[in-house]
Amino acid sequence: GEFAAAEARKALRRGLHVMIFSDNVPLSQERELKEEARRRSRLVMGPDCGTAIINGVPLAFANRVRRGDIGVIGASGTGIQEVTSLISEAGGGISHAIGVGGRDLSQAVGGISTHMAIDALDADPATRRIVLISKPPHPNVAGAVLARVGQSTKPFTVCFLGADSAELPANARFASTLRAAAEDALGGLELGAGFALSPRKSHASGRIVGLFSGGTLCTEAQLVLARHGRRVASNVPAPGSCPLDPDDGRCDRIIDLGADDFTRGRPHPMLDPSARDEMLRRALGDPGVAVVLLDVVIGCGAHADPAGHAATVLAEVEPARIAVVASVTGTEADPQSRPRQIATLQGAGVQVAPSNAQAAELALTLAGG
C-alpha cells in the first residue's frame, strides 16, 4: 500500500492502464490518481481491485470464463467472480470484466473509473449489454452513474447490493442479488432451476453462522437473511445488519474473513483457507448454531483445493445436527474445477447450492426460517 500510488503514477506517465491490487492507499491519493488517469485517457482499476478479465485474460483473483458479449463493471471482486462465473456456467460469455476498486463509487472518489469503464464498454462493439455491481454507492454518485447509463443505447443490469431499487433509466433493470444480475444479463434465464430449497433432513432451529472469504458474498448473504426477518450481525454490516456483539448470542453471525482486521499480517483466506478453521470448529461445536454457511471461491490465484481443505476440517467433527451449506464460485474451466469442488464438499456432507444467494436461502430454510 505504501508505494502503490507512486508506482501507479509512474505507469500512467508511461501511457499504461493500471490495476492496483494493493489496499491501504489513502482516498486522497486514489482520487488524484484517477483524475490524472482521466486526463491521460487511461483507466485505473483499484486500489483494492482484486479481479478483472480483459480480452478473456483473468487478472488476479478471476475465473476462466467463456468469451461473449456481456461486459461487467464492478466495485467488488467476488461480486464480479460470482456474476461472471454464473453467466459462463449457464452458457453465456464475457467480453470484459473491469474492476474499479471498492471505493470508486464513494463521494470522495466520485465514480471516476466507473464512468470511464462505462465509456469503454459502451464504445466496444464486442459488448452487447453491461452489468454494474457494487455495494450501495453514495446517492449523488449513483445518480450521476445512472444518468450516464441512460445515455447509452445498450441494455444495463444494475446490481447495487443493499440499495433500494432506484428510479432507473429505460435501458436499465435492477437486480437485488448477484444471481439475479446474472439471470437478467442472460435474458431472464433462471439459474439453478432444479435446485430445491427443501432440506434433505430437518434440523433444529437456531442461529446461522456464515464464514466467508468473499466480502461481497458476505454482504449478499446478510441481505438475504435480513430480508427474511433474521437478526444479523457482522464485522462488516450490510444495510439491515448490526455490528458484532460478543455478548449477543441471538443474532446470526455472518463474518467476512477477508476484511482488513483478519488479513493484517496474514494471507487472504482465498489464498489460505485455514483462516477460518478455528471459527468453523467453534461453530460446529456450538449448541446454539443450526447452520454453518460457507463460500468456496476458486479460480486463478486462489488456493488449489479450498473444498478439500474444508472437508478435512469437517472430517474432524462427528456427523452432527448442524447443517453445513456452501456454494462454489467459479467455473469448470478453473484450475480447481467447480464440479470437482462441489463433489468434494458433497462427499463431506455439505449441502451445495448453485449460487451464493441460494445457499443463504437454503440456510434460512434449514434454520427454521
What are these regions (language model features)?
Residues 1-369:
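Catalytic-core regions of core metabolic enzymes
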